[in-house]
């Protein structure tokens, strides 16, 4: 008996083709051929903790929207981050809250990076959340508030985070500013008004003599906060500045020494002048990019007590810098750095009260990718080399 249906020649041909395709697929699966797999667009980046809001909340989402590149971020102290790179942590982009920290740990006599770009400044500030500890803008002697034996001050540990040694530098500079009229920089800071200087000098000496220091001891302010109060458990050190707000909001500290940008981003109150600016003068807040003031910064160094020390580099303005790590370079790293140091990055940094440089400057420019060389200049001649190396 004949079957009720017989496939035509065309049908048999179709079946043969299908079987051939199946055979090829099985062959591919067996490993005889590997098709290219489309890689996701990702970038692994380290950044100083103080950039968590400007980058993590604002810049990175916009960068992802525009480029499709997903940015994996680690925020922490720049010094501890540099140690991670040295230990083999695979970051493509590294952003530091201190250009000298980046240079000394990742460029100088090392193989981790070969250039850096300085793109923003910042300022130190005195912050609080409890109005009980508010410092009135009309009150010029802020050092009394933070050095009382009964008040608790928090700062970052200088051995892990730049804001720690920058707080040390600020206190050392203030000590010189209020004690040494013979210093020509101090005279300039007071517009050569000796009677005004003497008002501050009298208040400084009267206060610190009560605490057991000699008259015109320029290190009294630094010593009281970072040695005496620390030993009395009324100065607390943390690993990174982004955790200082927790000390304030929990009541574990009355004041925190951190950046103006942190005060803005974390809704902290901070000491202001009568005109609404930073109450810590430019001569001590490390926010200057002025040759004369930066020379004043150089008179002190970053060294602290054994438990809060990173080295002895000269004082310098707070300068943020970025590089691409040599061994783990993502193809998207150059685009990220370019957008960070130009218009889009400048916009979001300014929103967080950083002070982005309208003209970023580079160190070892010839080692940079060509796209980045086009948007940087050499370091300005008025800046001491110690400010970025």
Swiss-Prot record:
<keyword id="KW-0732">Signal</keyword>
<protein>
    <recommendedName>
        <fullName>Uncharacterized solute-binding protein TV0544</fullName>
    </recommendedName>
</protein>
<feature type="signal peptide">
    <location>
        <begin position="1"/>
        <end position="29"/>
    </location>
</feature>
<dbReference type="InterPro" id="IPR050682">
    <property type="entry name" value="ModA/WtpA"/>
</dbReference>
<dbReference type="GO" id="GO:0030973">
    <property type="term" value="F:molybdate ion binding"/>
</dbReference>
<dbReference type="Pfam" id="PF13531">
    <property type="entry name" value="SBP_bac_11"/>
</dbReference>
<dbReference type="GO" id="GO:0015689">
    <property type="term" value="P:molybdate ion transport"/>
</dbReference>
<comment type="similarity">
    <text>Belongs to the bacterial solute-binding protein 1 family. WtpA subfamily.</text>
</comment>
